[in-house]
Amino acid sequence: MERAIAAEPNVAVKLCIAEGTIRINGSERKEVRVFVRNGRKFEFRSLEKNPETGKATWLWIASTSGPGPLSNCLAGDSVDIDLPVGASIDLEARTAGAVIDSVKKANVKIVEGSISLRNISGGIQANAYQGDVMVEGSGGPIELGTTTGNILAYDVKPGNVGDLFKAATRSGQIALEGVVHRQILASSISGSVAFNGKFLNGGIYNFKTTNGSIRMLIPDDSACKLIAAYGFGSFDSVIPLKIETENVTGGGKNFVGLLGKQTNGPLATVTLTTSSGSIGIRKQSEDK
């Protein structure tokens, strides 16, 4: 089944999907087009319209399958949706993987399945409870979460000063490359955390894992205030470190120091914490 409706370029679209893979793409057309393969019938419900044009500014895509559990949710072998590039999407799904490309903003929650987001310029909230979360070429405030999956972010930037990048997983790994937010919070309980990028002046960076390792791959001339705590693990840095304060107990070790050489402008503050894993800091030039 395929249907389309005229919409404003900045239309907000919400829907839920009970079953089926999901692909959402931005387009230059001022319409919302939906194709459900071998699935439930559906309809467009305009929750709000532009009074001048009559086009939808807030749209709910809902199933017309009748009463029952998840009765308002679309379902099928696959669901393909085309939206204006300035649109925002609010998606909840159960057993499905989602690929979202080239829309303004995305809010996604999936129970079983992975989430892939590309070219989302206005911010992301994505939670895959039993799947991976991957973000590429996107911007704005970003919050990513998963329970059992991994998180990968590549080429990501803030939209405004103060935008936060946050990633959290319980048993998966976190890998960040080219993430240029000045505020980054990344945490895992039993997985590793890896960062390949630059610490910007005045930035606040917090990387934490309980049972995994922390790996930083940064430019050779990096400088920051470093706060590190490691219980039964180890610490190693190839970049010179001047320790200012240090505390050693039976439960571990923590210190505050200057990594690299003092530069003009406020230094970034970097906090690295692990209970039983290792912390390693390497130069990007050594990885080439």
What are these regions (language model features)?
Residues 1-288:
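Intrinsically disordered, low-complexity terminal regions
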